[in-house]
């Protein structure tokens, strides 16, 4: 959905500028400065502290899945349908139907998703909070959400804002004659804004996010600060359809859409509704977060005419694409190819396109006055579908095969609004389609009897007697499970995709060593499964995790502690056919501080990448700290490098890493031979004792991390260290087990 225009740049920038609020600007100057302000290079640990569970007014015991499953979803849908055509005086509906507005709202809630870090998307309902609620591209969506409030108020905790924002758009399409393929609930609400890197710019609608080759910096997906996708007038406001196609392909690709899905979404989405640019953006007031308190969360107050209805200003663009703005049709593609398009300007001053044929000037009905008619419009980004050779071929095929287009749009729309939800096991409700789609990273169902406690004990014995080392078993289990991303719920140990392309060949996973470990574990798996007469099996996915657990139990025993690492079977093994290789490539770790692995292509430092990895794993500061300390003494670094292995007993689970890191008997210096490496010398003898990376030393250098490291380095912390390491380990191993809750370790010392 392309709803933004360059002529409004100045207006939107002015709208949020403190200069128009003198007292506010003065208050900003007097604000206390943060530590990050004084020491901008200090490691930012805030990603590991958000969101705060105490912010949730529903309480820790609230179970949204139970509430949603008790919801009368059909009743909600009927209420939404009624709302669509019940126009309100305070914000009149175009053509008497709010459907197109709700589609835009849903699209912009979900369309922030990006593949490189899994952030964005509809989960959490973040469109309610800053900055999304005040992005220029989300102008007037505050009205759409306010229209939904009576329905949210009626059904309360049984449906989240996050689900309602998406459901409304889905119902809108159905009510206007388009057949979707379904809807899944399960998006829980966030209760506070979170800090996400949306780009480096300091002003709205700027674009300073390209590398030297003109490509977007990772992990960003949108091309402009404050837009969902691209500038609809063309790159930097230049009306060049082919240049626009390049930007569309890049940004939609980074939002998990291929060329066919991109064409389907644009052509399908623009079958509905219109753009709004009755006048210049100078008439618009501040966005919601900068508006006066009396506006009660509304923004973009419009002083032009009535400020609503026919006088609405949103993007600065003006007009509808089709002759049926509130009914599903294929008229968008028909108009796109049947007319020659000439450049013009909207009343708001935005560049757009109209048919060269003057006979088309009365094709489109007016949104409010039945006596008026208009020409259809296209945006520069629409014409990209006509002139880009790849897009054009797809669009013409859709034009000639309407049923194929309908199916493609239905599937692309479903993907758009569900892409950030993770596997189908998280889907709720009666409208979930039965088909498993490859972008959902499917895994087979458990159609066999699971192993019991005796089997687990026997299997652990076989693993430990197989010749595999503690290091190899721990590294393999970690490599399998730590692909999980709590942002879009992708990755994790379930599926055992570590044995498949592309994961089996990732440098971070030590491919040759990994192949050896997997071969041994597969032999144990086959021998066990073939020996069972009652249909009992163990998956390789389970066996990989069990191997890591067994190795940790053995390592703890060497430290004097008998432990049982909690293990719950139930993972299954995906096939290569269930795995979209390209889709999984974005999960490859370019840095993993837990394994002391770092690819120099990163644009962040190793400690920053460690925090990023821990954040994706949903770890806290103590969990990140204890895991690094444990992984080091277990000798679990990639490539068997010895950086940070501060122990003379590698393979024994103890707190040596912290004890030796904090010891004043060591003096640290930068290596003169290897960039990024530090050398620890004995102060008394000058003898080289340790080597480390910045990831290792940050736990002694950063004051907050040092405080946690000290907690694990005390004489009475040995058992606590092991307990906490096991609990954090199990959290990672079970991160993708949405069917269970992680259990805590039980130590018998």
Swiss-Prot record:
Can you name a GO cellular component term? cytosol
This entry's comment on the bound cofactor is: Binds 1 heme b (iron(II)-protoporphyrin IX) group per dimer.
- Where is it chiefly localized? periplasm
Q: Which InterPro entries match?
A: Catalase_peroxidase, Haem_peroxidase, Haem_peroxidase_sf, Peroxidases_AS, Peroxidases_heam-ligand_BS
Q: Which UniProt keywords apply?
A: Heme, Hydrogen peroxide, Iron, Metal-binding, Oxidoreductase, Periplasm, Peroxidase, Signal
Which positions are annotated as binding heme b? Answer: 270
- Oxidoreductase as a keyword of this entry, yes or no, is yes
Per the record, the covalent cross-link Tryptophyl-tyrosyl-methioninium (Tyr-Met) (with W-107) lies at 229-255
Kindly list the residues the record flags as site (Transition state stabilizer): 104
Induction: what does the entry report?
A: Induced during exponential growth and is the predominant peroxidase in stationary phase.
Q: How is it modified after translation?
A: Formation of the three residue Trp-Tyr-Met cross-link is important for the catalase, but not the peroxidase activity of the enzyme.
Catalytically driven reaction(s): H2O2 + AH2 = A + 2 H2O; 2 H2O2 = O2 + 2 H2O
Signal peptide region:
1-27
Which residues are responsible for catalysis? 108
**Cofactor(s) for this UniProt protein:** heme b
Which cellular compartments is it found in? Answer: Periplasm
Q: What class of enzyme is it?
A: oxidoreductase
Q: Name one GO molecular function term.
A: catalase activity
- The EC number on file is 1.11.1.21
Q: Could you name the domain of life of the organism this protein comes from? A: Bacteria
- Give the protein's function: Bifunctional enzyme with both catalase and broad-spectrum peroxidase activity. Important for stationary phase survival.
Similarity comment: family membership: Belongs to the peroxidase family. Peroxidase/catalase subfamily.
Q: What is this protein called?
A: Catalase-peroxidase 2
**Source organism (scientific name):** Legionella pneumophila
């Amino acid at each position: 959905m392309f709803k933004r225009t360059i002529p409004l740049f100045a207006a939107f920038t002015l709208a949020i500028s403190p200069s128009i609020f003198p007292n506010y600007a003065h208050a900003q100057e007097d604000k206390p400065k943060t530590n990050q302000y004084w020491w901008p290079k200090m490691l930012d640990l805030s990603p590991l502290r958000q969101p705060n569970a105490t912010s949730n007014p529903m309480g820790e015991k609230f179970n949204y899945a139970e509430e949603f499953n008790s919801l009368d979803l059909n009743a909600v849908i009927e209420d939404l349908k009624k709302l669509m055509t019940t126009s309100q005086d305070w914000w009149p509906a175009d053509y008497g139907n709010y459907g197109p507005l709700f589609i835009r709202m849903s699209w912009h809630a979900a369309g922030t998703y990006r593949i490189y870090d899994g952030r964005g998307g509809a989960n959490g309902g973040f469109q309610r909070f800053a900055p999304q609620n005040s992005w220029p591209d989300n102008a007037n969506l505050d009205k759409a959400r306010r229209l939904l409030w009576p329905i949210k108020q009626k059904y309360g905790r049984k449906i989240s804002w996050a689900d309602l924002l998406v459901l409304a758009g889905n119902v809108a399409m159905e009510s206007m004659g388009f057949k979707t393929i379904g809807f899944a609930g399960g998006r829980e609400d966030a209760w506070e804004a979170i800090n996400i890197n949306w780009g480096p710019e300091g002003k709205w609608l700027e674009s300073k996010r390209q590398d030297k080759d003109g490509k977007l910096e990772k992990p960003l997906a949108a091309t402009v600060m404050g837009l969902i996708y691209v500038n609809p007038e063309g790159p930097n406001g230049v009306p060049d359809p082919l240049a626009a196609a390049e930007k569309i392909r890049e940004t939609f690709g980074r939002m998990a859409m291929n060329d066919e899905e991109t064409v389907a979404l644009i052509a399908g989405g623009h079958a509905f509704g219109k753009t709004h640019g009755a006048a210049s953006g100078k008439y618009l007031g501040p966005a919601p977060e900068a508006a006066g308190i009396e506006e009660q969360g509304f923004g973009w107050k419009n002083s032009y005419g009535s400020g609503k209805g026919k006088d609405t200003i949103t993007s600065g663009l003006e007009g509808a694409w089709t002759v049926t703005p509130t009914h599903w049709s294929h008229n968008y593609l028909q108009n796109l190819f049947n007319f020659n398009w000439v450049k013009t300007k909207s009343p708001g001053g935005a560049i757009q396109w109209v048919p060269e044929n003057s006979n088309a000037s009365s094709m489109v009905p007016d949104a409010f006055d039945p006596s008026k008619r208009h020409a259809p419009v296209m945006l520069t980004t629409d014409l990209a579908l006509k002139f880009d050779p790849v897009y054009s071929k797809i669009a013409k095929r859709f034009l000639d095969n309407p049923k194929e287009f309908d199916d493609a749009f239905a599937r692309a729309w479903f993907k758009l609004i569900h892409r950030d939800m993770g596997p189908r096991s998280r889907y709720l409700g009666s409208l979930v389609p039965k088909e498993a789609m490859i972008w959902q990273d499917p895994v087979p169902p458990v159609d066999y009897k699971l192993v019991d406690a005796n089997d687990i004990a026997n299997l652990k014995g076989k693993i430990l007697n197989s010749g595999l080392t503690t290091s190899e078993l721990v590294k393999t289990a970690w490599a399998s499970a730590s692909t999980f991303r709590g942002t879009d719920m992708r990755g994790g140990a379930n599926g055992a995709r570590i044995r498949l392309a592309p994961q089996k060949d990732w440098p971070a996973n030590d491919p040759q060593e990994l192949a050896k470990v997997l071969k041994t574990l597969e032999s144990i798996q086959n021998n066990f499964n073939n020996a069972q007469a009652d249909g009992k099996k163990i998956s390789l996915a389970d066996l990989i995790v069990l191997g890591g657990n067994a190795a940790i139990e053995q390592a703890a025993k060497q430290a004097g502690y008998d432990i049982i690492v909690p293990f719950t079977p139930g993972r299954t093994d995906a096939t290569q056919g269930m795995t979209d290789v390209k889709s999984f490539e974005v999960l490859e770790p370019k840095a993993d501080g837990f394994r002391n692995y770092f690819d120099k292509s990163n644009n962040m430092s190793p400690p920053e990448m460690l925090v990023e990895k821990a954040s994706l794993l949903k770890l806290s500061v103590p969990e990140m700290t204890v895991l690094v300390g444990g992984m080091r003494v277990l000798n679990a670094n990639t490539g068997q490098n010895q950086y940070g292995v501060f122990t003379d007993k590698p393979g024994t689970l103890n707190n040596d890493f912290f004890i030796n890191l904090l010891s004043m008997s060591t003096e640290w210096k930068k290596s003169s031979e290897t960039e990024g490496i530090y050398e620890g010398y004995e102060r008394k003898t000058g003898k080289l004792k340790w080597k480390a990376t910045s990831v290792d030393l940050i736990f002694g250098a950063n004051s907050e991390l040092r405080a946690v490291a000290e907690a694990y380095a005390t004489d009475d912390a040995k058992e606590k260290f092991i307990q906490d390491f096991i609990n954090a380990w199990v959290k990672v191993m079970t991160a993708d087990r949405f069917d269970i809750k992680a259990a805590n370790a039980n130590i018998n010392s």
